[in-house]
Amino acid sequence: EDVRSLLGFSSTRFTWRVSGVSFQIMGLGNGLGLCQYGARGMALLGFPVDEILKFYFTGVELKQLEKPTYLKPLIGKTIVLDPGHGGDSGGSGPMGLSEGYVNLEIARALAALIIKDGGNVVLTRDKNEYVSLSERVRISNENKPDITISIQQNIFPDDQVGGTESFYYPGDIEGKKISEYIHRELVTALPLSDLEVKQADLFILRETNNPSVMVKVACLSNPQEERLLSEPEFRQKVAKSIISGIEAYYHD
């Protein structure tokens, strides 16, 4: 009578039967992965994806990946910056400006812009010290970056020679594209002669396992260009030109 009243049946003559029984059993398994049949069964029972994964993999947490946006175009990208020379390595200009110092200051300014764009940055050196070429390559390859950018200056016997040039390794298709984008921004923004984009069999370009470019920003041996390189505003303009080239490459 209680059942009839609870279910609202008008008749006292009714029967019932069990239509099905469901068991959830954790198998013996080797615990190395997901069972597609078990996972499908849980899905049919209405379990959400994160609960199914947690059932098979301890400590798993689903997170929504960030995607590049107009304001953060480098999200998910890692870029290795290689400030050339350092320590007693490298030359200096007529006024005594050290190439290692200039390269590091430009790299630091560029690193800040990359981070602002949402990217990750690895520096092959972050102070005025000597780092061997093989160590620079090791740092780059170990971090598996999307791009490696080596920042250097030219020093020529003739102090009247000046300009900016960029290099990529022969056959590095993406390296060529990146160097062209960066170089275009540099020659557009800076009051320097265009020494063009060139192929070069340079150690840092050859031995890195990712698209790599070398930017020779200016000629430190040229007194006028040394003066420019000594100015923080000019170095910031260089960094902005390089980041603009990187952004253009990823927007293409």
Model-inferred region functions:
Residues 1-77:
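Conserved, single-site charged/polar hotspot
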Residues 18-19, 88-91, 114-118:
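A short alpha-helix capping/helix-coil boundary motif
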Residues 77-78, 97-252:
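Active-site-proximal helix/loop segments of hydrolytic enzymes
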Residues 77-96:
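Short glycine-rich His-centered loop
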Residues 29, 42, 93, 126, ...:
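Short, flexible active-site loop motifs that bind/organize anionic cofactors or intermediates
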Residues 28-29, 86, 220:
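Short, glycine-/Ser/Thr-/acidic-enriched flexible segments
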